[in-house]
Amino acid sequence: MARDTVRAKSKPQARSNGRQASARGGFWRFVRQLIAVVVILALVVPPVSVVVYRFVPPPITILMITRLIQGHGMDYQWRSLRDMSPSLPAAAVASEDSLFCSNHGFDFDAIEKAMKNNERRPNRIRGGSTISQQTAKNVFLWPGRDYVRKAIEAWYTVLIEAIWGKPRIMEMYLNVVEFGPGVYGAEAASQRFFHKPAARLTAAESARLIAVLPKPLKWDVDEPGRYVVRRTGHIDRAMGTVRNDGLADCVRR
């Protein structure tokens, strides 16, 4: 009789343990499936989006949405590279990435220097991003400096270098980069600050637009401070070297 009672009690307990084990197994199956989905999306979505934007302009970016939420508005006017002054890509190369035409999306010397500088002076973060890296960030990603975003940025950089090529990268860069609060792209900036289309910008005007790019919410194209004025002059002079040495020739179509 006692044995029968023990067996009767052990059966519900065994069923309970079985259900718990099944639940744990189901949870881990879900986790594995979720990881698989994330990996597949990470491998598929970036190439597809890069291919699409090889042919069409992005309607909006994450940064634009962020600024809209912050109340900055959005002035975004797409123009082809042919409809911009040639001084614009020259100024961008002079200021942001002198090896743009010869690198493959990454300037490892600049990255190493930036890392050493940031170790010595953590309160003054210095970037080592190329124009291609900045374009990948501006078009596809969110603002920030975390390592996850930088890793995704590197993957997008490889893709746009392979699929877009230098002319399209420069065209995209000059169309989506932020020149002021809610002002995106060279055409919107040219109309806002100089009351003319981007095709008619002078070298000095292009240099001033590019000069504010590191801190477009802090530095003003309309009322440039002394540092922006000095930076504009430096870029303007460096553009001569860019032209003479053909450092921006790869963007010609």
Show which residues each predicted segment covers:
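Juxtamembrane regions of bacterial inner-membrane/periplasmic proteins
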Residues: 2-253
